[in-house]
C-alpha cells in the first residue's frame, strides 16, 4: 500500500468525486481511497483539483469518479475492489495521462 501511495499525485486530474453510503458494508476500501487522496501531501500536487466526498444515505454502491484534464474519465466501482487495487489503478492512469500530456509536443524542445 505504501508503494501505491508514494506514486500518488493529482497533477493531470481536474476533479475527484467519491460517492458512498456509510451504512453499507462494502465501503471500507472506498473510504480508505478517499482518505489517501485527501491527504495534504497528495492534495498539494494540484491545488486546483477539488476532492469531493459525496456521502449519501440511499444504499448506493460506492463509486469513485475521476475527471482528467484531457477529458478522460475513470470510474471505479468500489464494492468489489480493495483499496490497494483502486490506488494502483488510479496511479497507473495518472502516469498514463502524465505521459500523454507531456509527450512529444511540437515546440517543446527549448534548447538551441
From Swiss-Prot:
Record's keyword terms, sorted: Mitochondrion, Ribonucleoprotein, Ribosomal protein, Transit peptide
Claim: Transit peptide is one of the keywords in the record: yes
InterPro entries per the UniProt record, alphabetical: mtLSU_mL53, Ribosomal_mL53
GO CC aspect terms: mitochondrial large ribosomal subunit
Principal subcellular localisation of the protein: mitochondrion
Compartment(s) where it occurs, according to its Swiss-Prot or TrEMBL record: Mitochondrion
Top-level taxon in the UniProt lineage: Eukaryota
Pfam family for this entry, one: MRP_L53
Subunit structure of this chain's protein: Component of the mitochondrial ribosome large subunit (39S) which comprises a 16S rRNA and about 50 distinct proteins.
Family: Belongs to the mitochondrion-specific ribosomal protein mL53 family.
Annotated protein name in UniProt: Large ribosomal subunit protein mL53
Species name: Pongo abelii (Sumatran orangutan)
Amino acid at each position: 500500500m505504501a508503494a501505491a501511495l508514494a506514486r500518488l499525485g493529482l497533477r493531470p486530474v481536474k476533479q475527484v468525486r467519491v460517492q458512498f453510503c456509510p451504512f453499507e458494508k462494502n465501503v471500507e476500501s472506498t473510504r480508505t481511497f478517499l482518505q489517501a487522496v485527501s491527504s495534504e501531501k497528495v492534495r498539494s500536487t494540484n491545488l486546483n483539483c477539488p476532492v469531493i466526498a459525496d456521502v449519501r444515505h440511499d444504499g448506493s454502491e460506492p463509486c469513485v469518479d475521476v475527471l482528467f484534464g484531457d477529458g478522460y474519465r475513470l470510474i471505479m466501482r468500489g464494492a468489489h475492489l480493495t483499496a490497494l487495487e483502486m490506488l494502483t489503478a488510479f496511479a497507473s492512469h495518472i502516469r498514463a495521462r502524465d505521459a500523454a500530456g507531456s509527450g512529444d509536443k511540437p515546440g517543446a524542445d527549448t534548447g538551441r
